[in-house]
């Protein structure tokens, strides 16, 4: 068991995008739109959480390589019933950044869920997360 040897692989431009969503109550959606969550601005805090998770992926997942992250973009979309998060990560390296994008989406949505529990704890559905 160990980390895969990527030392002989060429350095290439790598990009990965992951997306996910949590289903929320109308009260939770309204608190996001109006910026009135008891814990603060949901999208702002969750963006920070997503970026931090991207950067810390190898600390959380021991078989992931520490990768120099060149760019990380976090986007949010609010619909009538869901909060969507999309994280895109870019680098020039010997291995991809799929796990970093997935970790970013996961942490961003979990942070949002944590921040919205006081608003509507029983009407939250945990994230659906996809690598796109």
State what each model feature region is.
Residues 1-42, 46, 54-57, 70, ...:
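Flexible, solvent-exposed loop/hinge segments and secondary-structure transition points
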Residues 81, 128-129:
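Intrinsic-disorder/low-complexity peptide segments enriched for small residues
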């Amino acid at each position: 068991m160990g980390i895969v040897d990527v030392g002989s692989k060429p350095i290439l431009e790598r990009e990965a995008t992951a997306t996910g969503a949590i289903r929320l109550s109308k009260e939770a959606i309204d608190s996001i739109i109006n910026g009135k969550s008891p814990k603060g601005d949901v999208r702002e805090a969750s963006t920070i959480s997503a970026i931090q998770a991207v950067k810390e992926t190898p600390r959380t997942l021991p078989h992931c390589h520490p990768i120099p992250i060149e760019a990380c973009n976090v986007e949010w979309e609010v619909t009538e019933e869901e909060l969507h998060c999309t994280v895109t990560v870019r680098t020039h390296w010997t291995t991809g950044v799929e796990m970093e994008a997935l970790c970013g989406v996961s942490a961003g949505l979990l942070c949002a869920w944590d921040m919205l529990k006081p608003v509507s704890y029983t009407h939250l559905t945990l994230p659906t997360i996809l690598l796109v």
